[in-house]
Amino acid sequence: MTTAQNHTHYYPGATYMHALTLATEAYISQFSKKEVQASAVQIIMQLNQAMAIAIENAGLAEAMLEKAVEQAEQLSERGYGGYAQAIGYAVHFNYFISEGLAEAIVLPELLRSYGAKAEQQIASLARQTGIVAIDLPDERTARLFISWIEQQRILFELPDYIEQMHPQDIPDIIDETLDAALHFYPMPVFYDAIDLEQFISPLLASNKSKID
């Protein structure tokens, strides 16, 4: 089991997951426009292209990664975002660690929780990015895409909990998440503080198995 360090580190994987989160949530936003969705697809494809050349050309891969993050953050600044990004912001604000560390953990669970209200959009994103190339029903395609996101966190060896977080921090993190989420266009499902706790509490180390 991997954990976040006690001070800020540059995680290429966390940077990747941050951009992936922003692009995914922008795509499935209820008011997302065609050009926004096209940008989200391009961002995810660019992220994967960067990782594909990382060993042979690390400098170019890093430049592509940073460009993808910049483009993803532009979508966020326009109001296209979601709860995973809002949770990532709250964790970053409290502990000064990369948003991507929290987003990598919560994004799959949030996407699953949306169920039928988002599976068509998730499936469309999966197909357009080439993540799921075969012709499957939306529900199956969406599940494969979400599983792929989980595999990215594992491949990057990113933490599955936030070491710095304590139970007493959760109310503040929920409040900050709700405040950040107000800036975004409607997500597929509206969540209140009680709903969000089910996604934020699992970030605690105490809620994880101690078996590595």
Residue locations for each model-derived region?
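Short helix-capping/linker segments at secondary-structure and domain boundaries
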Residues: 27-32, 113-120, 209-211
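C-terminal charged capping/lid subdomain of soluble metabolic enzymes
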Residues: 132-212
